[in-house]
């Protein structure tokens, strides 16, 4: 044994009693390591390879044990590039799973999968660390109440409400407003619920991660002057990282969120962008470990891996983690095993529509395609349910009439249908809303609309009280009183 005492990563201190093995085989990001008899590390233990490559450069690679092969060998997956590693190099067993910093010190900072800051703002002053592999809360700790998580965004709260401690799938292509919607949710949970957010960038583009960070600084979600006032911690494992890092970065983000829920007893928003990349990384690792692939080439452990992550995202009696997960659907095939497995865990879906974005209606949430298991009369109440159904029926009828309008024009419709179209166009515009985080771009101040105000506004449109108002009065306003005031101003101008 080497007499060595150094500190590595977030929380692993290596001492005299080190358990040291040697690399016996390297296949890409997978290492086989031989340990002395009776000194085998456990599954999920963190191993550290330190040394120098042939060019004399320092090497520091963290790996995670995935398989015990027999003959005193383990197979581990590297969390960073394995360039420069050689057979025969010493590998130190840390004796514990990978641990990452948690707590207030993480807010406003960017971390990698190992919990190391990557934003050039110096070390993180975190006194507490948690292992990334933790069991889900016990059944007795779970909160069984079905309660709505109010976001202050009209279209979401009315038509596809989020469940407190639930999981929401966010569907949308490039450039339809996913990032702005995510930032508005982060802003609103901080202001209305006193909560914090954790953003896990899993296997997405580095450019997008950088853009998100810059936009968060611009909209003051991350406060550069006083970093402790920031509302979000960012954890990135992007496309260029090895599959081991992409597979575990979701767990790192979740572990940071669990601290705020379990210790600080807060409501937390956890964003995962993109949950499909988590599955994809698991599939790569599974193939590298030599497992027989399952349907469509995915890993045989797909459901287990997804379940292990998703079951930790829940409400307890102390606090909640509400998760919003961007879902990439490969080749738009909803029956593909990756999205199909994800759907089994979702409580609501928010679908962003390019058609609405093209009309300038933001947030471009599709009111007919977005769904929620919470939209039941015994959960949200009769009034909310009836209003939501009325809005959906009106919009659906308008959608059916659009072909006739395109060919024959509005004048050929019956009086009743013309009224439906007029109300639907008002509803469509009233579903738009100015965002706090977009103030910089739009110039109009953001609005948080309570659920009661939202229901009242749509009831007034459906009942015909506001039929005389011009439809532009409903565009990009908060509650219905603002629409009334805007209508009065428009009439004055005319």
UniProtKB/Swiss-Prot annotation:
The keyword Chloroplast applies. One of its GO terms (cellular component) is proton-transporting ATP synthase complex. GO terms for molecular function: ATP binding; ATP hydrolysis activity; proton-transporting ATP synthase activity, rotational mechanism. It is an enzyme of class 7 (translocase). It comes from the Eukaryota. It is a peripheral membrane protein. It catalyses: ATP + H2O + 4 H(+)(in) = ADP + phosphate + 5 H(+)(out). Its main location: plastid. Keywords: ATP synthesis, ATP-binding, CF(1), Chloroplast, Hydrogen ion transport, Ion transport, Membrane, Nucleotide-binding, Plastid, Thylakoid, Translocase, Transport. Its EC number is 7.1.2.2. ATP binds at residues 172-179. PROSITE patterns: ATPASE_ALPHA_BETA. HAMAP family: ATP_synth_beta_bact. Belongs to the ATPase alpha/beta chains family. F-type ATPases have 2 components, CF(1) - the catalytic core - and CF(0) - the membrane proton channel. CF(1) has five subunits: alpha(3), beta(3), gamma(1), delta(1), epsilon(1). CF(0) has four main subunits: a(1), b(1), b'(1) and c(9-12). This is ATP synthase subunit beta, chloroplastic. The gene is atpB.
């Amino acid at each position: 044994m080497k007499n060595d005492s150094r500190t590595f990563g977030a929380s692993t201190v290596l001492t005299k009693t080190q358990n040291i093995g040697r690399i016996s085989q390297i296949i890409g990001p997978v290492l086989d390591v031989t340990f002395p008899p009776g000194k085998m590390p456990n599954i999920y233990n963190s191993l550290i390879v330190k040394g120098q490559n042939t060019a004399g450069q320092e090497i520091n690679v963290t790996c995670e044990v995935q398989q015990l092969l027999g003959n005193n060998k383990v197979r581990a997956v590297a969390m960073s590039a394995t360039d420069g590693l050689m057979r025969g190099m010493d590998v130190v067993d840390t004796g514990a799973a990978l641990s990452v910093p948690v707590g207030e010190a993480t807010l406003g900072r960017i971390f990698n999968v190992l919990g190391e800051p990557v934003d050039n703002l110096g070390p993180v002053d975190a006194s507490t660390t948690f292992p990334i592999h933790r069991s889900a809360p016990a059944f007795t700790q779970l909160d069984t109440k079905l309660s709505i998580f109010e976001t202050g965004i009209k279209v979401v709260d009315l038509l596809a409400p989020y469940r407190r401690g639930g999981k929401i799938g966010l569907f949308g292509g490039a450039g339809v407003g996913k990032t702005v919607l995510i930032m508005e949710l982060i802003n609103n949970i901080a202001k209305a619920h006193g909560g914090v957010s954790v953003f896990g960038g899993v296997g997405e583009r580095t450019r997008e991660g950088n853009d998100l960070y810059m936009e968060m600084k611009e909209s003051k979600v991350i406060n550069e002057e006083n970093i402790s006032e920031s509302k979000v911690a960012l954890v990135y494992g992007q496309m260029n990282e090895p599959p081991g890092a992409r597979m575990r970065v979701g767990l790192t983000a979740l572990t940071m969120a669990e601290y705020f829920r379990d210790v600080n007893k807060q409501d937390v928003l956890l964003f995962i962008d993109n949950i499909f990349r988590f599955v994809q990384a698991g599939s790569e690792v599974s193939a590298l470990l030599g497992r027989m692939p399952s349907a469509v080439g995915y890993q045989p452990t797909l459901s287990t891996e997804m379940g292990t992550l998703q079951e930790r995202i829940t409400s307890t009696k102390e606090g909640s983690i509400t998760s919003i997960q961007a879902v990439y659907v490969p080749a738009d095939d909803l029956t593909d095993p990756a999205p199909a497995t994800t759907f089994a865990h979702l409580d609501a879906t928010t679908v962003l529509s390019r058609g609405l974005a093209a009309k300038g209606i933001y947030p471009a949430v599709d009111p007919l395609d977005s769904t929620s298991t919470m939209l039941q009369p015994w959960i949200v109440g009769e009034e909310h349910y009836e209003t939501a159904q009325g809005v959906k029926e009106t919009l659906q009828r308008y959608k059916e009439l659009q072909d006739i309008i395109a060919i024959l024009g509005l004048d050929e419709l019956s009086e009743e249908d013309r009224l439906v179209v007029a109300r639907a166009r008002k509803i469509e515009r009233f579903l738009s809303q100015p965002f706090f985080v977009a103030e910089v771009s739009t110039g109009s101040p953001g609005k948080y609309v309570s659920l009661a105000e939202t229901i009242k506004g749509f009831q007034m449109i459906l009942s015909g009280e506001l039929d005389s108002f011009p439809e532009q009065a409903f565009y990009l306003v908060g509650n219905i009183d603002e629409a009334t005031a805007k209508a009065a101003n428009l009439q004055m101008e005319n």
